[in-house]
Amino acid sequence: MRVLMLGWEFPPHISGGLGTACLGITQGLTEKGVDLTFILPSMKEEEAGQSETKLRSASGVPISHALKKAVERVRHQQNYDEFSELLMRPVNARLHPYGYDYSQSVDANAFNSDDIAEISHFHGGYKDDLMDEVYRFSTAAAAVVLEENAKKKADVIHAHDWMTYPAATIASRLSGLPFVAHLHATEFDRCGDHGWDVIYGIERDGLHAADHVIAVSERTKRIAVERYGVPEHKVSVVYNGAFLNEDIPTFEIPEAIKNEKRVLFMARITFQKGPEYFVEAARLVLNEMPNTRFIMAGSGDLLPRMMKRVAELRMGSQFHFPGFMRGKEEVYRMYSMADLFVMPSVSEPFGIAPLEALQCGAPILISKQSGCAEVLPAALTVDYWDVRRMADRIMDCLNYPVMAQESLRQCQADLQLLTWGRAAEGILAAYSHVCPNA
């Protein structure tokens, strides 16, 4: 089976769980014998040779006039004409859902014609010009898909999250290949009911354009069905996995903090991850257990507000902000030094971080609003908004380490079932809905 996969990030350049999940998925599928090419906006030339996955960059790909016109026709049919206007200013309007069964073949030589209309370059990532990059990537990625499909016939296009849905939709319409959308997170997860209608529209259009949808949890499937109107039969649930064979180094805890209890939050410091609830729970814990150290590792738009709140509560000596952790060793060091890892997410589609914490031997306390709670029944859970209960749970774990260790032991046993190989089997089953003969 041959898969052309579209993604926005891939190790070593990641900003969160999406890149990690893409790595696990590609490794799992490759081990199952899948011929897979991963297409992303940009990468360094040397990275293509270092990765076990076949990587293709859409940066610098020539776009012929013929292909550009074909893409524009698809955009018109898919109501993407208004997308270009959204690049100039934020607007409060939904994109229309797809309402056409449209397919058009393109000459296999259209992508490499000498008559070049444009060449796009991308930096990737999530900068201020993200919408512009998403728009241009939809053309460049389509060119790469057509080229790869001409080299060797593919069976399916698999696209990760909203940034790649327009590209996958256009590539699918031009190539005739089925499109599977992988839903790792939604605008409702990221922003609650106050998200950007433009992104919601792109997500909704992409999920309706897809021939099949993969959701990372039952929670995410419910959102796809109830908030995006995706037919329930069109959505398969495939849980993420963990890198179980990875060697976890051991770390010495510095003498200066050996006698303290350490509670860790490590995530993007944004609305979705619930950092404010962690800060308020820390206040309640420190009132009763002042010999506790809280760590909030990560970066994000709420970081300044969290630092200000910690200062207002006069917790600076016991609450630390080490910043974004770069590299696996730094991440593993933080987990390994923690007596408890807390994930108080407001809405977490799955949550790979708790799996990593468990691998490093850290007990976990996760919100009931997280997808990974579905597959970790022994995990300690709390409603993200119940700060008093969260503080009590934290103190229970710190005061009764036997209880925390028993939860850890049971969670680590459940973790053995969460392999990327098992995830790959679920993805292959999802593919069978759209390409049964592959």
Can you name each region flagged by the protein language model?
Residues 37-151:
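A conserved catalytic-core segment of Leloir-type glycosyltransferases
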Residues 305-325:
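Nucleotide-activated donor-binding/catalytic signature segment of Leloir-type glycosyltransferases, i.e.
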Residues 324, 332-338:
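Short alpha-helical donor nucleotide-sugar binding micro-motif in glycosyltransferases
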Residues 379-388, 396-401:
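Conserved acidic donor-binding segment of nucleotide-sugar-dependent glycosyltransferases
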Residues 346:
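Aromatic "clamp/platform" in nucleotide-sugar-dependent glycosyltransferases that forms part
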Residues 256-282:
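Conserved donor-binding/catalytic core segment of Leloir-type glycosyltransferases
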Residues 363-366:
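Short hydrophobic beta-strand element within catalytic cores of glycosyltransferases
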Residues 219, 241:
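Carbohydrate-associated surface elements
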